[in-house]
Amino acid sequence: MPASPAGDGPRTPAVPALPVQACVGAVVLDDAGRLLLVRRRNAPGRGLWSVPGGRVEPGESLAEAVEREVHEETGLVVRAGEPVGRITIPGNGVVYDVVDLVCTLSGAPTEPVPGDDADAVTFADAADLDRLACTPGLVATLRGWGALPG
């Protein structure tokens, strides 16, 4: 029996890769060490608390995107700092590639107001983080990155 060429044999259909959507999240702590959170109005995460963030628009840097998202969702002005971590989250027909950046409050206003995709916004301390319905893995991930005080 002649040798078969390499690659002959049973074949499995190629699984198309899901599109990847670049996203950002903002890790913003106030002077009291509380984390800025928004309650999501829309999917994914509707009704759950998470850090402000969203999709990176074409032509935007990560810093520009996170500063824009925080302002749209909370009315606050922040300055983007260094990335603190990166996660991938499977979505409905897409994979979200999320880079979370540490951000600092930069001037007025200092009280957040919900807007855009947020139906509520708050600064949460450690006790709040334990009782709020946050997006899956949020608190554990941020703690694992050392992004939360205490």
Residue ranges of predicted features:
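Conserved N-terminal beta-strand and adjoining loop/helix that marks the start
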Residues: 2-35, 55, 86
